[in-house]
Design a protein with these regions (language model features):
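A generic "structured core" feature
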Residues: 32, 117-121, 177-178, 209
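Asp-based, Mg2+/Mn2+-dependent phosphohydrolase catalytic module
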Residues: 1-17, 125-130, 136, 141-231
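Short, acidic loop-to-helix structural element flanking the phosphoryl-transfer center
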Residues: 91, 97-140, 175
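A metal-dependent, Asp-based hydrolase signature
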Residues: 60-109
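A short, structure-level motif marking secondary-structure boundaries and short turns
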Residues: 65, 69-72, 111-114, 131-132, ...
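Active-site neighborhood of HAD-like aspartate-dependent phosphohydrolases
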Residues: 2-62
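Short coil/loop linkers at secondary-structure junctions
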Residues: 46-50, 95-98, 156, 188
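Flexible, glycine- and charge-enriched loops at secondary-structure boundaries
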Residues: 29, 33, 79, 171
Length: 231
């Protein structure tokens, strides 16, 4: 079920729309099934790469729980967020940071682009086009790099932010990322709307900034109901 927290009567009364990407602008469940099949085929063709998949598994867990793992890390002043996470995973798996980085780039950034387009959410894609037609500001804010995925999905935004940006440097639900965006556009919190797929990440980050939000359901059937907000 969609979770909607709006103080304004009309969604078009907001000035800035901040969208999450993964699981929001495309349907994540069928995409992950397709990616799993792709990875299995890749491992059969490249058996030595199986260790990299365990590295990726660890990396995803570390990023998901970075609020916990980050406290164990003492390199905050020396490296960027991405570098710290690569180094942490490397220390846990007994490999180099470069190997972690290479595995992330291949399996999480490059390979998904080959299978992603069919899973685009046309409902939110249409909303973004409508917002642009009305000269609204569209921002993408994700914990992962976004530019290549946006291009792959055929979606254009006015600005893109990731948790690894130098002026953010923290993962959702830390409120800093949204605060940076609001400051960049000189926007009051009551004039911004966050749209994501996870309350525990996107919703809480929005709440901590006093920003309204919509948490979209994972099903197409439920997402269709959102059209009533802007039709």
């Amino acid at each position: 079920m969609n979770r909607i927290e709006l103080k304004k009567n009309n969604i078009m009364d907001y000035d800035i729309f901040i969208f999450d990407l993964d699981g929001t602008l495309y349907y994540q469940k069928p995409f992950r099934i397709k990616m799993l099949c792709t990875l299995i085929k890749y491992v059969f063709a490249h058996p030595m790469s199986i260790k990299d998949l365990f590295i990726i598994k660890e990396y995803r867990e570390v990023r998901e729980q970075w609020e916990k793992y980050g406290k164990e890390d003492s390199s905050a002043e020396k490296m960027s967020l991405d570098e710290r996470q690569y180094a942490y995973v490397a220390s846990q798996k007994g490999v180099t940071s470069e190997r972690v980085k290479h595995a992330v780039e291949l399996f999480m950034l490059e390979m998904p682009l080959r299978v992603l387009p069919p899973y685009r959410d046309e409902i939110l894609g249409d909303l973004i086009q409508k917002l642009k037609d009305k000269k609204k500001t569209v921002v993408i804010y994700s914990d992962y790099p976004v530019e290549d995925k946006l291009k792959c999905l055929g979606i254009a935004a006015d600005a893109c932010y990731t948790s690894g940006d130098a002026d953010i440097g923290c993962m959702k639900p830390d409120p800093k990322g949204i605060r940076v965006i609001l400051n960049a556009f000189n926007c009051e919190s009551n004039n911004a709307l966050m749209i994501g797929d996870r309350y525990e990440k996107d919703g809480i980050a929005a709440e901590k900034n006093g920003v309204d939000y919509i948490i979209v359901d994972c099903s197409k059937k439920e997402r269709r109901k959102l059209r009533d907000l802007w039709s």
